[in-house]
Curated annotation (Swiss-Prot):
Keywords: Antibiotic, Antimicrobial, Defensin, Disulfide bond, Secreted, Signal. InterPro entries: Beta-defensin, Beta_defensin_dom. This is Beta-defensin 30. It comes from the Eukaryota. The keyword Nucleus does not apply. Gene3D superfamilies: Antimicrobial Peptide, Beta-defensin 2, Chain A (3.10.360.10). It is found in: Secreted. It comes from Rattus norvegicus. The lineage of its organism: Eukaryota, Metazoa, Chordata, Craniata, Vertebrata. Disulfide bonds join 35-62, 42-56, 46-63. Belongs to the beta-defensin family.
Length: 75
């Protein structure tokens, strides 16, 4: 009878699982949310000190700081 009570207590304690943030690891997410050789970030809107260079997928902008922008040679 004691082991039955112990098992019931364990089931009750294990059924109460605390909420955990699910999803991709934050380090992996950081790699996939970057663009332009890991110097830019994929965002909806670029910040004040950033400029838009290319697209990330179909709906996000690759925002790069001006100092990280590649030099474009023009004839």
């Amino acid at each position: 009878m004691g082991s039955l009570q112990l098992i019931l207590v364990l089931f009750v304690l294990l059924s109460d699982v605390p909420p955990v943030r699910s999803g991709v690891n934050m380090y992996i997410r950081q790699i996939y949310d970057t663009c332009w050789k890991l110097k830019g970030h994929c965002r909806n809107v670029c910040g004040k000190k950033e400029i838009f260079h290319i697209f990330c997928g179909t709906q996000f902008l690759c925002c790069i700081e001006r100092k990280e922008m590649p030099v474009l040679f023009v004839k």
